UniProtKB/Swiss-Prot annotation:
Any one biological process term the GO annotation gives: intracellular iron ion homeostasis
Name of this protein: PKHD-type hydroxylase Abu_0724
Pfam families from the UniProt entry: 2OG-FeII_Oxy_3, PKHD_C
Cofactor(s) demanded: Fe(2+); L-ascorbate
Organism (species): Aliarcobacter butzleri (strain RM4018)
Lineage: Bacteria, Pseudomonadati, Campylobacterota, Epsilonproteobacteria, Campylobacterales
């Protein structure tokens, strides 16, 4: 499932993040690339040791944990500490697949990567090129979202970032270990939750809505890994 989640950051949060990122000290992004991806990666990144990194991470984690659509789609067990990168002057990231296991330096623990996310800090009209291209069983998807919006997709997806030929593209990228390991099970639960919420809006807490909700929570109980 590939999902666009709009307005993850408020206007105030977005403005603060952009102002800080515009003054940040950027380093070579190859530092965090895995063996498979290191030759494909051509961008800049905030160092994990930079105090700004943890400050921005707190803003993003707070925003994600208070976003109902994100919670419904990801069913997160753990949000691996976000990273931040910048593309300019032809910067790009060739085809790659994210590592299946990542170590979170803040938590001092390894986590499974079920879901990958990119949160945009720059609007599409601020740069040329820089499309994120995600390939899955349904085809190829080009992604270039408004600032403050997020794209969510399975970490097993082949993806790339096209060269930025003009302007600057800044994003945060992160991974989620979900309570639900299987992508198709997460998709089933997401669609079921959407149906329940829609029924509640249109008809209130009727018997059918309650019954569906019971089945939803039974599936969560059956499929979740805690």
């Amino acid at each position: 499932m590939i999902l666009h989640i709009p307005e993850v950051l408020s206007k105030e949060q977005l403005t603060e993040c952009r102002n800080l990122l515009n003054k940040a000290n950027w380093i070579d992004g190859k530092i965090t690339a895995g063996n498979q991806a290191i030759n494909a990666k051509n961008n800049f990144q905030l160092a994990e040791s930079d105090p700004l990194t943890n400050y921005l991470r707190d803003i993003i984690k707070t925003a994600l944990n208070s976003n109902p659509l994100f919670i419904s789609a990801a069913l997160p067990k753990h949000i691996i500490s976000p990273f931040f990168n910048k593309y300019e002057n032809g910067g790009n990231y060739g085809n790659h697949v994210d590592n299946s296991i990542l170590f979170d330096m803040n938590e001092k623990k390894a986590f499974r990567t079920d879901i990958s996310c990119s949160l945009f800090f720059t609007d599409p009209e601020e740069y040329e090129g820089g499309e994120m291209v995600i390939e899955d069983t349904f085809g190829t998807h080009e992604v270039k979202l408004p600032a403050g919006d997020l794209i969510l997709y399975p970490s097993t997806s082949l993806h790339r970032v096209e060269p930025v030929t003009k302007g600057v593209r800044m994003v945060s990228f992160m991974w989620i270990q979900s309570m639900i390991r299987s992508a198709w099970k997460r998709s089933i639960l997401f669609e079921l939750d959407n149906t329940i919420q829609s029924l509640r809006v249109n008809y209130g807490e009727i018997e059918e809505t309650l019954n569906l909700s019971i089945h939803y929570h039974k599936l969560i109980q059956e499929w979740s890994e805690l």
